[in-house]
Amino acid sequence: MSAASQRVGAFGEEAGYHKGLKPRQLQMIGIGGAIGTGLFLGAGGRLAKAGPGLFLVYGVCGVFVFLILRALGELVLHRPSSGSFVSYAREFFGEKAAYAVGWMYFLHWAMTSIVDTTAIATYLQRWTIFTVVPQWILALIALTVVLSMNLISVEWFGELEFWAALIKVLALMAFLVVGTVFLAGRYPVDGHSTGLSLWNNHGGLFPTSWLPLLIVTSGVVFAYSAVELVGTAAGETAEPEKIMPRAINSVVARIAIFYVGSVALLALLLPYTAYKAGESPFVTFFSKIGFHGAGDLMNIVVLTAALSSLNAGLYSTGRVMHSIAMSGSAPRFTARMSKSGVPYGGIVLTAVITLFGVALNAFKPGEAFEIVLNMSALGIIAGWATIVLCQLRLHKLANAGIMQRPRFRMPFSPYSGYLTLLFLLVVLVTMASDKPIGTWTVATLIIVIPALTAGWYLVRKRVMAVARERLGHTGPFPAVANPPVRSRD
């Protein structure tokens, strides 16, 4: 057997996975998996920059995030795969598209891991005992601990994410209850009256004008990143057709309550000027209301969120890198699988990239979070656009009688897909308008695109060789032993 066919194996990219995620774990990942540093830490700086109208941005972005998830849900039920939309890009647009989106998504999660290690170090330094420890050392310790846990098994990942997501959800619910009590009772916070009068006394709903609201959109998009993880995780659960629709449809309530509701409540409890970048707005609130130890307790929660996000990032990149490695687009070692069903090669590669973030914490500790956050947003925009494009392609092929769409579908397709792509383009343009960090981030595409192009020419012969081998073993679809049944009408 050739080297290519050995990599492909009898069942393609899904070989070796243990399908060990339980329904309750996937449900909780769907509910709380995306509640991470983008909300717990990033919302503080965005409130300070854009004002209370920020909750409207969360709402608008949330609508499109839900549409993206419905598109992903349709693709998953069309053909479950741990390679997620990288595998679907290969199916609908070919190897070149899978190569490009796979590496862009890897860039997203590699940068997200840097964001998370930076956030963990930032949270820890809120306590005096850790202020004497350099930020980069704290980031390195966090990476080492989470990497070790992630390499054990998918069951460990699922259990860690279940409890971490539960803690995050309970913490946000506690904030919503306490905040609502203060708001309904008109109790002052830090000497300020609560409610709509707070907005009137501090410049209204848009105190900094509409432009900052547009500019912070890329950061809000990052706050929603990881919602697509439910699609990746569905490839490692036994019955995705039963639990995927429930997990995705629960996103509507989660967006309305946890994202839009919490940001609106924060803006009604304290002036937007009370929040600041680098500090969780939830920690700010609990510290201001005088609850003894409440700020420290909330800091533990947001620390859990950052650790959870880092854990999820390593999980996701391991699976994505395994998928593109099985096609020949990534280094061979990233296709390696442990006996416990963990694609450790891709996970370790992500950890190595994250070490550059540790170095960034050493040289630019004050700017590390915003720099890599913007770079991460580029990857998630590419990933989400791919999901929508694949769904549109499935819709077109179904109309032509070539494929069949599952019952769980993206609503108002194809028009909702076109509108979502337009939204993502607007986000990219507004990111470029955020000088200097956002402008420089988008400018890095001048380097990224030629680098991806050059990389493709380096690996294309190997990719095509693997594709030819795979066609003889699994059909054109590497995720299943037999390609899906197609209509011949």
Curated annotation (Swiss-Prot):
Q: Which terms does the UniProt entry file under GO BP?
A: amino acid transport; transmembrane transport
Transmembrane domains' residue ranges: 25-45, 49-69, 100-120, 137-157, 162-182, 210-230, 255-275, 289-309, 344-364, 369-389, 413-433, 439-459
Alphabetically list the UniProt keywords.
Amino-acid transport, Cell membrane, Membrane, Transmembrane, Transmembrane helix, Transport
Q: Name one Pfam family in it.
A: AA_permease
Q: Name one GO cellular component term.
A: extracellular region
Q: Where is this gene product found?
A: Cell membrane
Tell me which InterPro entries the record gives: AA-permease/SLC12A_dom, Amino_acid_permease_CS
Q: Which domain of life is it from?
A: Bacteria
Q: Is Ribosomal protein set as a keyword in this record?
A: no
> What is the membrane topology listed in the Swiss-Prot or TrEMBL record?
Multi-pass membrane protein
Family designation: Belongs to the amino acid-polyamine-organocation (APC) superfamily. Amino acid transporter (AAT) (TC 2.A.3.1) family.
Q: Which PANTHER family match?
A: GABA PERMEASE, L-ASPARAGINE PERMEASE
**Annotated protein name in UniProt:** L-asparagine permease 1
